[in-house]
Amino acid sequence: MMMMMMRSTCNLTLMLCICALVVASMAAEGPRDFKVGDEFGWRVPLQNDSAVYSHWASSNRFHIGDSLSFVYDKDSVMEVDKWGFYHCNGSDPITAFDNGNSTFDLDRPGLFYFISGSNQHCTSGQRLIVEVMHIHQHHDHDASMPPSMSPLSNSASPYASASASSAASSLPTACLLIPLFLTIASFRFISY
């Protein structure tokens, strides 16, 4: 009976160690290239899905050093200012691409606004706001960097963001301590 409990505890400890390694490797992730819209790509949304790009952006986290890949056919993509975004006005773009496979480097924190070069496509929902957070942080939390807001929000609480950031940065540490705690607890249980 005692041997079976020891084996079970060892298996659990091994599984938790593997979990900790996976979580730690995810925390050390470097710059990424995001294909805008995933498999949908950069095209006019379906009639009942004009928020497809808002949903896509809110399901991703963008950092300085990441890039966006726009894949499209017979269209274009423009980076515009906030006014150009909300009015689907591409008359004075910051950057414009029309080669069908365009990559845009996210080189600063803050909001980036993208629209289709076709006014009709833009008003049908082919536009995107991306919020870029600071550089990918590996293990140390830089207290000099202000917390980022969540995607597409204009007024996130800095306290909520700071606590979420600190909770996320302590996750790998917690995962590493769990197997140690279980091992110690199992030896204490076995010795009685």
From Swiss-Prot:
GO terms for molecular function: electron transfer activity. It is a lipid-anchor; GPI-anchor. Belongs to the early nodulin-like (ENODL) family. Pfam families: Cu_bind_like. Glycans are attached at residues 48, 89, 101. Residues 167-192 form a propeptide. Mostly expressed in flowers, and, to a lower extent, in seeds, but barely in seedlings, stems, leaves and roots. InterPro entries: Cupredoxin, ENL_dom, Phytocyanin-like, Phytocyanin_dom. A lipid is attached at residue 166 (GPI-anchor amidated serine). This is Early nodulin-like protein 7. Residues 32-134 form the Phytocyanin domain. May act as a carbohydrate transporter. Disulfide bonds join 88-122. One of its GO terms (cellular component) is plasma membrane.
